[in-house]
Design a protein with these regions (language model features):
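Helix-termination/interfacial motifs at the ends of transmembrane alpha-helices
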Residues: 7-10, 14-26, 128-207
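Large intracellular
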Residues: 4, 8, 15-139, 211-253
Length: 253
């Protein structure tokens, strides 16, 4: 469970809700037609940009923003070096049955044990990386689309409200309440875009970048293990994937 995402998302929404409660009547900020225009319109516009299957599949990708727990790259390096040491001393078949934490690394080692060539293994793993990134990018695209559509639908709802207000100006006392209702759609659109969609899109993008880096690290690890590379030489290559502050510490192990 990613506490930072939950805290940021619900904390941001909580601040908005708290300000509404402290500022006056809650009912003033609730208007069903405005909600229908913004929420319904936003999702319909988003559906125009991606397929229904991608739209539904994106919600599974969204869970990664809250449930994602990746393996630190330094741990991947440590595991890869251990496997490389065994493979160099006892042969690649000695890795069969090893308990490997990272599934992608485990898949790569199994391909090596099955006797596939280095080129074939690299091609299959690279394809897996690209397809996974495509799936993640669909989720990111959906939330970016929501972030773009929500304010626009909010503005459309506000314009609808203004037209209705201007068409019924016989009673001056009704102008203020009608204007408030018209502006609610803009508020809803801004909240959906800036407090929900944009933060989730940014989080998914950060997770995708981190996973891509980890998988490229594994890709190079598998190639080194399969080629019988010296574990120390492999370690020197892999520490390049770490932040500068962690490279010297990891290289000294």
């Amino acid at each position: 469970m990613d506490i930072a995402t939950l805290l940021g998302l619900f904390g941001g929404l909580g601040v908005i809700v708290a300000s509404i409660f402290l500022g006056g009547s809650v009912n003033t900020f609730v208007n069903i037609p405005s909600i229908v225009v913004v929420v319904g319109g936003t999702f319909m516009v988003t559906l125009c940009q991606i397929s229904l299957a991608q739209f539904l599949g994106s919600f599974k990708v969204t869970l990664r923003a809250f449930m994602h727990k990746s393996i630190p790259p330094e741990k991947l390096i440590e595991e890869a070096i251990g496997l490389a040491d065994v493979a160099r001393k006892e042969g690649i078949l000695a890795l069969e049955g090893n308990d490997i934490d990272d599934k992608f690394l485990d898949d790569g080692i199994k391909l090596c044990i099955d006797g596939h060539s280095t080129e074939t293994v690299q091609k299959m793993l690279s394809k897996d990386i690209n397809l996974e990134l495509d799936r993640q990018n669909t989720g990111i695209l959906m939330f970016k689309s929501i972030a773009e559509a929500a304010p626009a639908m909010g503005m459309i709802g506000t314009l609808i409200g203004l037209v209705q207000m201007l068409a019924n100006m016989d009673d001056p006392k009704s102008i203020g309440p009608a204007m408030a209702v018209a502006l609610l759609t803009t508020l809803y659109g801004a909240i959906i875009a800036n407090a929900i969609a944009l933060p989730i899109a940014a989080k998914l993008k950060a997770i995708s970048a981190h996973e891509r880096l980890n998988k490229l690290l594994v890709l190079e690890s598998v190639a080194g293990i399969q080629d019988g590379m010296n574990p120390r030489v492999l370690q020197q290559q892999l520490v390049a994937y770490l932040p500068e502050s962690k490279r010297e510490l990891n290289a000294g192990k």
